[in-house]
Amino acid sequence: MHRRTHRQTHRHRSRVLLASSLAATLAVSTLAVATTAAAEPSDGSPEAVAALTDQAAASLADLPAQRLAPLAQATDVLAPGETAGSPNLAHVANIPKNGGFAPEGQYSTDLAFQGRYAFAGNYGGFTVYDVANPTAPQQVAQVVCPGSQNDISVYGDLLVLSTDSSRSNDSCENVAQSAAIKESWEGIKVFDISEPTAPEYVASVETQCGSHTHSLAPSQDGEELFVYVSSYSPNAAFPDCQPPHDLISVVQIPLDDPAAAELVSTPLLFPDGGNPGGNGSSTTSGCHDITTYPSKDLAAGACMGDGILLDISDRAHPVVTEVVRDTTNFAFWHSATFNNAGTKVVFTDELGGGGAPTCNPTVGPEKGADAIYDIVGGELVFKSYYKIEREQAATENCVAHNGSLIPVPGRDIMVQAWYQGGISVWDFTDSANPVEIAWFDRGPLSAERLILGGSWSAYWYNGAIISNDIQQGLDVLLLDDPVTNAAKSVVTDEFNPQAQPTYTEPPAWSKGTAYAGGTTVTYGGAVWRAQWWTKGQTPGADAWGPWEEIAGVDSAGVGAWKPSRVYVKGDSVTYEGTTYTAKWWTRNQAPGDRWGPWDPQD
């Protein structure tokens, strides 16, 4: 196992230090493992929400590492009710929170997908949406089962739900109860979703310090489902959450008998106690989130003050193989995303616990950001940071949060939620020079006070971006860009962003192979799609030939003009140093002709 603490060298000048994150996913969503159960927003009442906001402010003031830099004067930011975005990303649908999930304190949380359905967590339970038609999604079920934060995953006929707030029991009729009471319960719940519109509760497993998040890893023989449970912030006053807590919990669910789910191990990840904290870095007392890559027997953990790699070839006994720290800019290691090849990891820093306005010039571009690491010889090698450049208002919580890959062959592109900073699509194919290629943003929920809101999770699923907004419910967005359109051909039956699948790259073009229309291949470092049946015709040899180049961008993140590619009105390209926008359908017409299809952009 390797352990390195490093201070980064950056391309941007340093900014005022904005300190460590709260030991909770959301500062204003205080969980019972860290505070008393009285703060649990189980009913979403104005009184409960106000108490949480006051408590979050007090928590920030009480922690020496939580001294926030003064906010810069917000300029050119959206007003409440306004929206904005890049022309290649369209917001096409929204289903507001409703029923018992409507109150402000009932936060919408994570997402999982299966078939035509999206399963959306909420502090009050979970909702099932039919997203087969992304422009007209429908709510088809709502399950009331309180217990924040209801992190959610699906696998086959099973749905797994996390509870990280102390409850009176493991039923869905529970109420908040202090973690200081031995009989209180936290852990995971298992539901049968063989009928997705009518889930049935079948099992529960109590875990130490509850289950803030969880990740799935099916056994190699396909007979069991292993659940890696992440939790943190032990307290000597809590009988079931005693310090030290340098471990995760592993739950095994027999797929032929899910009611027999049980805790099988509690691997010690930090025998030396992990990051001791200080200098703006969080003290490690467990993990916030683990992302598995089951086909590669690999996982990445975001563990408060540490980022780790794990070998999960023995599913019940994962082993840490690499540890890295960033004591200069990372306050709270929150989540991780691999690239498709498993040769990179994007870690997120949830500075301020998700409840603070950190997207402004005072905080700067390197705190509350993503950090891109290459995996070289099993070691994590820092390459760069990525953070949205749009300034957000002082009443908008904004920091890097949950996202997923967009399966573009030959490129590393992800979509990501930034709370009230909106949604960003960005390319990290060049690890040292990430670039944004699309975005969507709403104005603040209020100009007078910070209401915790924005996109908790934004993921790509079968051609659409689906987001769960903390206050405004389910959003669907459609991305139309020549850089990413190849991803629309990738269809999956199931998707849990924290259990990454492997997307199969197109095969290399072969002169002797016959290709039907729609087939994709790689050739000359690019991805090509056959427009019709072809054999023996080299991609790129003839601009009017059967092959259309569908993936490839320049260093600025805009697609370079290619003669073989089909462009439609609104598409942007670069050509000889100038950016152009198509005025109508075009192919093999080079930009530069004032009477042609391309409009130069100043």
List PLM regions with ranges.
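Feature marking well-ordered beta-strand scaffolds used for ligand recognition
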Residues: H2-R4, S20-L22, S29-L31, E40-E505
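Tryptophan-rich substrate-binding surfaces of secreted polymer-degrading and adhesive proteins
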Residues: P501-D602
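Sec-dependent signal peptide recognition
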Residues: R15-A19
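N-terminal secretory signal peptides that target proteins for export/translocation
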Residues: M1-R13
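A residue-level detector for conformationally permissive "hinge/kink" positions
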Residues: S21-A24, I413, I465, N485, ...
